[in-house]
């Protein structure tokens, strides 16, 4: 039963940056002994609110009330000392220091200027035991797993007697076992009467942990769900994006042109048997398969990231010799890779540079001078047309959300003369609203005659977007399904590895 008095309240919180209104009039309550989830599209304002709570940002308007008192923190240390801790996706620890030193950093027990290591390790050991972990407090942090690092962050919060602990996308780098352990710890913290704020785009986690869910959209408060028996996936999606779940994919039948892409018995590292398939102009073909099916490996080979070891790739009936990515680009074939941060973007360069970097060679002045006028116009055009949310074209792309990074990569290829686009997990790690925008870009490309081949491990996405689904299993094609006839049972049946029958 919900308590009558909230422990944490946000009252009319607003935050404005130069040219950007990040939060507007955010008001809601959180109660002790509850996990309160914050949901919304990337850029909805969840992380900004946590940074205000933790003292990273000062609110432009409004106030934070903790246990009946209006609070204002000058920095994160002040917030932590007041019992507010944020566990970020990027953990803020010192690898060369021991577990105990990290837990009590800034308040190491000492006498006469000398650290009392015996007391330090004893106190740290108590915090570790509290979390049910078996870690030597004298171990240098660099020898621990990411999941153990996270436990050290939580122990650090408990050492400051934190009553409010917020988790910002905490499972993004964890194994299944580490996620289970994190959930166990969060449930224990809830039992102890702490306020737990939990930010994640993974709905299965939200439903597994939450006692209440607050939804944000475009920096504004939308709704708080408090009866978890009455809320489902569709209701959350509708609250986040302002439309029904049935509208998310938006597939419609369309006509196709001539064959644009053909693979003839193509093999590449990680592809077990020769792959043959064709994609027509204006057609969207989805590649579905479980982990290890060979989807990404096939695309990397097609794009020249790895070497095709057998077979031939054809574009518009012409054989293409692809030994490196520049050969594929020249032929009109582009790739949005699975790991966009490592392989798709140049993190320390601007949005403008990331959009223009491929087509730049065609627009240099006198063969050697960058055409700044063209680059500025081209970047601004794609920022507007793709609705890339950024303060400006000169913003570093690493500061954008995953969905906006992906749209910038698409803008890069839209600057080229594209015939074929390969999309490898194009919406992984992207919120629902940004996914919808990516789907619309895919449909627009198909309408322009581009052949679209996209790989995804999200089966509802493949079934919802593709005109035709090619199912891969252990490096080979297991079957094909048409959009109108395909269902999850058929696709999974084809994707599951064959089980050899033992003779009794």
Swiss-Prot record:
CDD domains: ABC_Carb_Monos_I, ABC_Carb_Monos_II. Its EC number is 7.5.2.12. It is found in: Cell inner membrane. InterPro entries: AAA+_ATPase (IPR003593), ABC_carbohydrate_import_ATPase (IPR050107), ABC_transporter-like_ATP-bd (IPR003439), ABC_transporter-like_CS (IPR017871), P-loop_NTPase (IPR027417). SMART domains: AAA (SM00382). GO terms for cellular component: plasma membrane. Keywords: ATP-binding, Cell inner membrane, Cell membrane, Membrane, Nucleotide-binding, Repeat, Sugar transport, Translocase, Transport. One of its GO terms (molecular function) is ATP hydrolysis activity. The keyword Calcium does not apply. Residues 8-243, 256-499 form the ABC transporter domain. Pfam families: ABC_tran. ATP binds at residues 40-47. The complex is composed of two ATP-binding proteins (AraG), two transmembrane proteins (AraH) and a solute-binding protein (AraF). Belongs to the ABC transporter superfamily. Arabinose importer (TC 3.A.1.2.2) family. Part of the ABC transporter complex AraFGH involved in arabinose import. Responsible for energy coupling to the transport system. This is Arabinose import ATP-binding protein AraG. It comes from Escherichia coli O6:K15:H31 (strain 536 / UPEC). The lineage of its organism: Bacteria, Pseudomonadati, Pseudomonadota, Gammaproteobacteria, Enterobacterales.
